[in-house]
Design a protein with these regions (language model features):
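Loop-rich non-cytosolic ectodomains and luminal regions
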Residues: 1-172
Length: 172
């Protein structure tokens, strides 16, 4: 798995400034040379074909959404945050990036690949889950939202972060 040059990179950005309290992207998904159904009547791009090879976010997003839907079907009690954390905590490493200079594979940073490449089967068996609500994003500093990633951005001298997890395999 590799991250292509046109992929978005982190850190998170809110439109005015970079936010160094959480990491983006969360994960990466397949998005290059994806065989997809196509309308043969379309005259704008490829005419007469029923399947074409496409790349970009339009191809990686359905992979991620499909993985999330499979997990929700298998675990109807999981919240969207639980599903996100399962995908993040079981993502596959290493993920490389393609060098724009010579096409060679280079190591990635967390700002290139997030937690790594999604692995729906591993996520299905995730042992620990994080949870948060939309209100947490509205009312808490980003560093205090119970995300599946922890990042110490701009720290003067000392900082503490904590996360709460629950077991997905054992119940009380």
């Amino acid at each position: 798995q590799s991250v292509v040059g046109f992929s978005s990179r982190g850190p998170a950005y809110d439109g005015d400034e970079f936010i160094f309290d959480y990491i983006k992207p969360d994960v990466v998904a397949p998005g290059v040379n994806i065989l997809a159904a196509w309308n043969p009547a379309d005259t704008g791009f490829v005419h007469g074909e029923t399947f074409i090879s496409i790349e970009g976010t339009s191809m990686s997003t359905p992979h991620a959404a499909g993985a999330m839907l499979l997990l929700k079907g298998a675990h109807p009690d999981w919240s969207p945050a639980n599903i996100q954390s399962a995908l993040m905590s079981t993502a596959t490493l290493p993920v490389n990036q393609v060098s724009e200079e010579d096409g060679s594979l280079q190591p990635t940073s967390v700002f290139d690949r997030g937690s790594g490449a999604i692995n729906a089967l591993s996520a299905y068996n995730a042992g620990l889950l994080f949870d948060y609500s939309a209100d947490d994003f509205r009312n808490l500093p980003f560093s205090e939202v119970n995300l599946a990633s922890i990042f110490f951005g701009e720290v003067a001298s000392q900082a503490t972060r904590s996360r709460t997890l629950r077991s997905s395999t054992f119940s009380n």
